[in-house]
Amino acid sequence: MSQAGPGGGQASIASITDRVTPVSLGAPVSSVHFLRDNAVFVGAEESVAFVDKAGEIGRVATHGGGILCAVSDGKRVVSGGDDGKVVAVDAEGEVAVLATDAKRRWIDCVALHGDGAFAWSAGKTAFVRSGKGEEKSLEVPSTVGGLAFAPKGLRLAIAHYNGATLWFPNMTGTPESLTWAGSQLGVTFSPDNRFLVTAMHEPALHGWRLADSRHMRMSGYPGRVRSMAWSAGGKFLATSGADSVIAWPFASKDGPMGKEPAMLAPLPVRATVVACHPKQDILAAGYEDGTILMVRMEDGGELLVRRNGNPPVAALAWNADGSRLAFADEQGDAGLLAL
């Protein structure tokens, strides 16, 4: 990987654009996930597109309207829609309706747990259904902004206005409240289960050290953080929202408190989405001008995956072993990179 400074042109960055298989989806994309050898592109309306290694497209209808959220555990893609349904599609393209909101409210957020449990939200209510089919619900003070399961145990983080709630659905005790003024829109646990981080409506992140609820404020962004990804070992949290990838250090017991973040892959435009390699300290970053870079976190070395002059990048995902990268922009122009 070669390096280019903030003013460096794309011509100075080593290119692997010739390894990309282009895919034209013809419709906006909100996220992409891998199920076995297929990249599954989640559209904004009604269906997902299965794309194989050769770039052949097969569409699967999942919702009767807009798709508002989607997550994957590598076995299935679970999505929520404005039809009030939580829907799963597996690697074979088989579709199952997992839940339907009794009031047909929009399903705003979804989350998956390793043991087969899943969570979803509608309005102020978060729901969890265990792998055994037992369903629980919890109402929080305001509309749910994000959901995330802890890496250990059946514990759900629920982001909302003025903080987050930590809930053990299988326990009768009062859920734990973590407070911070403002609207929290996304939430993630660190892989070692020591920290919780939320993305705020304002251009900032907020975090808590779970052992003592100590606050961690991560600010200075010119725009909202819409994408967060943990590095393979959990040492860094990579984020969008600035004209470089901001990577906060989380290796020490204090996390990023008192430390400066790394600023990787600077460009004249903002990063829109980030995805960390599952095995190595490498990330992919997409930008407002359509550029996609692959970046080595150790020294900032860069490879050009896609040139600028395109709509903003909307989705990035690695497959399980990190040998393939899928991407798409807001207009549905996509690609598959084989390494």
Question: Regions from the language model: what does each represent?
Answer:
Residues M1-L339:
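WD40-repeat beta-propeller superdomains and closely related acidic/aromatic-rich repeat-like regions
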